Amino acid sequence: FLPLLAASFACTVTKKC
């Protein structure tokens, strides 16, 4: 899991970008 990918996933799930 890449850090950038993890950040993108978290953004999608929490709706906090």
UniProtKB/Swiss-Prot annotation:
Disulfide bonds join 11-17. The keyword Zinc-finger does not apply. It comes from the Eukaryota. Transmembrane segments: none annotated. The keyword Secreted applies. It is found in: Secreted. One of its GO terms (cellular component) is extracellular region. GO terms for biological process: defense response to bacterium. Keywords: Amphibian defense peptide, Antibiotic, Antimicrobial, Disulfide bond, Secreted. Expressed by the skin glands. Antimicrobial peptide. Belongs to the frog skin active peptide (FSAP) family. Brevinin subfamily. This is Brevinin-1AVa.
